[in-house]
Swiss-Prot record:
Domain comment (free text): The common region of ST and LT proteins comprises the J domain. This domain is essential for multiple viral activities, including virion assembly, viral DNA replication, transformation and transcriptional activation. This domain is also required for cyclin A-transactivating activity of ST.
GO molecular function, one term: zinc ion binding
Lineage of the species this protein comes from: Viruses, Monodnaviria, Shotokuvirae, Cossaviricota, Papovaviricetes
UniProt function note: Promotes efficient viral genome replication by accelerating both G1 and S phase progression of the cell cycle. Inhibits host PP2A by binding to the A subunit, thereby displacing lower affinity regulatory B subunit. Inactivation of PP2A in turn results in the transactivation of cyclin A and cyclin D1 promoters. Late during the infection cycle, ST may induce dephosphorylation of host MTOR, leading to the inhibition of cap-dependent translation. May establish and maintain high levels of viral genomes during persistent infection in cell culture.
SMART domains registered for this protein in UniProt: DnaJ (SM00271)
GO cellular component, as recorded: host cell cytoplasm; host cell nucleus
Segments forming H1C3-type zinc fingers: 129-151
Protein's organism: Hamster polyomavirus (HaPyV)
C4-type ZnF: 109-123
Keywords recorded for this protein, A-Z: Acetylation, Activator, Early protein, Host cytoplasm, Host nucleus, Host-virus interaction, Metal-binding, Oncogene, Phosphoprotein, Transcription, Transcription regulation, Zinc, Zinc-finger
Descriptive protein name: Small t antigen
Length: 194
């Protein structure tokens, strides 16, 4: 995420969003701030047209950049849709079963890093991390290259424990499902049993 915008653009976007700097990278929180600021700055609502244009430009550059980061990582697990055609978030995709699909067995899923046969979202994103890193042979330095729980913990400086899973769930929920490059039909379904 830090490579998408220049330092000045990042600071300008943080300022325009009225976002605390420590929340940079929390896409869901940033998206809420963006929507709120759009309502405040919209020229039809008496807002500042110049600031609105700057906000839209920076926000679009960030979203397009995050989308491109994922596209450049290599072969896709699923057919990609255009960024304007797929706006469903991960939580919208799985609606009522999102939290159960995210992590099937927290203790087991957190412990079994690269060898898990589980198909919950947490384990699938971890497997994806290992496949990408094996082929690219570089660490994840930018949030958005990888959305696994380990990179999330590293990015925000948190230990990988059971207590992290709810924060991770909240972080992943608003992210467009297409950015995660998951085959949604392979994700664990609690309704169908083990």
């Amino acid at each position: 995420m830090d490579r998408i915008l220049t330092k000045e653009e990042k600071q300008a976007l943080i300022s325009l969003l009225d976002l605390e700097p420590q929340y940079w990278g929390d896409y869901g929180r940033m998206q809420k701030c963006y929507k709120k600021k759009c309502l405040q700055l919209h020229p039809d609502k008496g807002g500042n047209e110049e600031l609105m244009q700057q906000l839209n430009t920076l926000w679009t550059k960030l979203k397009d950049g995050l989308y491109r980061v994922r596209l450049l990582l290599g072969p896709s697990q699923v057919r990609r849709l255009g960024k304007d055609q797929w706006n469903l978030s991960l939580q919208q995709t799985f609606s009522g079963t999102y939290f159960r699909r995210l992590c099937r067995l927290p203790i087991t899923c957190l412990r079994n890093k690269g060898i898990s046969t589980c198909n919950c979202i947490l384990c699938l994103l971890r497997k994806q991390h290992f496949l990408l890193k094996k082929s690219w042979r570089v660490p994840c330095l930018v949030l958005g290259e990888c959305y696994c729980i380990d990179c999330f913990a590293l990015w925000f400086g948190l230990p990988v424990t059971n207590m992290l899973v709810p924060l991770y769930a909240q972080f992943l929920a608003p992210i467009p499902v297409d950015w995660l490059d998951l085959n949604v039909h392979e994700v664990y379904n609690p309704a169908s049993g083990p």
